[in-house]
C-alpha cells in the first residue's frame, strides 16, 4: 500500500484572525506537513520613516506610537533617547524613573496580550479573558497620565509631557500587589496543561546559533538560552540602579518562549516596585528653554512666553548636526532608532529597526517539517505586529 500525499499551496491570511495582523503567508505543503512558508509583507506600509523627515522632532513622536501599537511607550523611549543624545541635554531624575516605570507597565501590556492571544489560537479562551482584565487596568494608567489609552505621545526629548497625576503611583502600587497572584492563576492553568504542552513543546525550535544568525532579540533570543537584555548590557535612564533578573530558556521552543515572557512580567513587577519606592521629587522636563515650553502661568503674564510657546510647537527646535543609534529593550526585542541630523529642526533621516522584522524572517525555517496547525502556534510565539514590520 502506497501513501501518496498531494502537494498543495495554501494562502493563509491576510484576513485570517490567527495571523495577528495583515500577514499573507504562502504555505507549500505535502498533505499537512509544511515544506516552505513565504511571508508577504507590506500591506500596512505607511511610509513612516519618510513622513518623519517632514516633521519636527516633537511632531515625529506620535508616529512611534503607531508602529508597534501594543507597546507604544517603549518606542517613544528609543526616539527620545536618540534625540537627547544629539541635543546633549540632561534628563531630570524623576522623568527617568517615570519613563522606566511606564516602559515596564508597557512590557506587561504587551506580554499579557501575547500570552492571552497565543492561548486563544490553540483553543484556550479563559487566559485571554483573565489577562484582558489586567490590561484594562494598565490602559487606565495610560489614560490618566497622557489622556489616551493607546497612542500616548507621552515621552519627550528632555523628559515626559506632564508629571504624574495625584494618586496614580498609589494605584499602580495596588495593581502590582494584586497582579502576581493573577499571573499565578494563568500558570496554574497552562504550565502543566497536557494540551498546552503538546501544542508548544518542541515546536518552532531555534538553536542559539540560529537565533544569533537571524538577528533575533528579546524573548525570541532569550528563549534559546542567550542572556542578552539591553536593560542589563547597555542600561539607559535608571535601569542600572534596578535589581532584576534576565529569564532565559534552554530548549528554544515555543514553550520556553512562553515561560520567558511569563517570568519577564514578574521581573517587570519588581522594577515597577523599585521605581515607586525610589521615585524622587523634582521636575519632569529639562530646564532648557529651547526644548521645554513655558508654563501656562507664564504665558498669561508674558507676550514673549506666548510667542516662544507658539514657535516651539510650530517650528520646533534645532538639533545639532550628527548621527546616533539608540536602542531600547522593547517587549518584542531590540527596538532601535538611527537619527541623522544636519542641524535643522527636522531629522534628515530616521531609520527604524523593528525586532518583529527579523523574527518574521525566521518563520520559514521554524515552520519546516511541522503541521499546518503548528504554524499558527509559531506565528503567535513570534509576537509580531505589522505596524512595526511594515512601517
Swiss-Prot record:
Main location: membrane
Compartments reported by the entry: Cell inner membrane
GO MF annotations in UniProt: NAD binding; NADH:ubiquinone reductase (non-electrogenic) activity; quinone binding
Record flagged with keyword Cell inner membrane: yes
Pfam family, one: Complex1_49kDa
Membrane-topology descriptor: Peripheral membrane protein
PROSITE patterns hit by this protein: COMPLEX1_49K
Cellular-component GO terms for this entry: plasma membrane
Keywords assigned by UniProt, alphabetized: Cell inner membrane, Cell membrane, Membrane, NAD, Quinone, Translocase, Transport, Ubiquinone
EC number, as in UniProt: 7.1.1.-
Record's catalysed reaction(s): a quinone + NADH + 5 H(+)(in) = a quinol + NAD(+) + 4 H(+)(out)
Subunit structure: NDH-1 is composed of 14 different subunits. Subunits NuoB, C, D, E, F, and G constitute the peripheral sector of the complex.
NCBIfam families named among the record's database cross-references: NuoD, PRK06075.1
Family the entry assigns: Belongs to the complex I 49 kDa subunit family.
UniProt function note: NDH-1 shuttles electrons from NADH, via FMN and iron-sulfur (Fe-S) centers, to quinones in the respiratory chain. The immediate electron acceptor for the enzyme in this species is believed to be ubiquinone. Couples the redox reaction to proton translocation (for every two electrons transferred, four hydrogen ions are translocated across the cytoplasmic membrane), and thus conserves the redox energy in a proton gradient.
Name under which the protein is recorded: NADH-quinone oxidoreductase subunit D
Organism encoding this protein: Rickettsia bellii (strain OSU 85-389)
